[in-house]
Design a protein with these regions (language model features):
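Signature of the catalytic double-stranded beta-helix
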Residues: 1-52
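Extracellular structured ligand-interaction cores
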Residues: 15-17, 26-28, 58-62, 70, ...
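Short, solvent-exposed loop/turn segments at secondary-structure junctions
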Residues: 25-28, 35-36, 68-70, 89, ...
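A short secondary-structure junction signal
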Residues: 30-34, 41-43, 72-77, 86, ...
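A short beta-strand-loop-beta hairpin characteristic of the jelly-roll/cupin
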Residues: 56-85
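A short hydrophobic beta-strand segment most commonly corresponding to one strand
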Residues: 60-64, 89-93, 106-123
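Short beta-strand His + acidic residue motifs that chelate non-heme Fe in jelly-roll/DSBH
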Residues: 71-73, 82, 92-105, 113
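Active-site or metal-binding loop neighborhoods of secreted/extracellular toxin and effector enzymes
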Residues: 117, 121-142
């Protein structure tokens, strides 16, 4: 229920897919560009879908579930992200930015990855959120 409230209430997504990722010491996800081949509507094909023509129809958000630990990195374009806090949310224009992750540290890094169709609420959230924005997210307690 909390994951649904976040997707629909705060991010304004619908027809979304939610994945829990864990990255342990020594794992990396090489730099890549998303094409959403694994989305259920694409069914691992390279058929052109509406969001290939208009990428704003689908967006991806990542929610960090635990605080950053030494040795963990998140790379997007020319930026390297570290020092995140549990509950921090990042997103990017999936069709334009190469990205990847690595965990050289001792602690496992956990994220929730939302990929879904956008609404006006999604774009309001994106356009009115900065790196300093604060949103009330209670993802750890009942």
């Amino acid at each position: 229920p909390k994951a649904i409230a976040l997707a629909e209430g705060l991010l304004g997504l619908y027809d979304y897919e939610l994945k829990l990722h864990s990255q342990v010491c020594g794992q990396l996800l090489h730099m890549h560009m998303d094409n959403f081949a694994a989305r259920l509507d694409r069914q691992n094909s390279f058929d052109e879908l509406d969001y290939d023509v208009d990428p704003k129809k689908v967006h991806r958000f990542v929610v960090f579930l635990n605080d950053w630990s030494m040795g963990q990195i998140w790379h997007q374009g020319t930026a390297v992200h570290t020092h995140w806090k549990a509950g921090d949310i990042i997103s990017w224009h999936w069709q334009d930015f190469p990205h990847g992750t690595a965990n050289m540290g001792w602690d496992t890094r956990y994220i929730l990855q939302y990929t879904g169709r956008t609404t006006d609420k999604t774009w309001d959230f994106i356009n009115n959120t900065t790196k300093d924005s604060k949103h009330k997210l209670n993802i750890h307690k009942e």
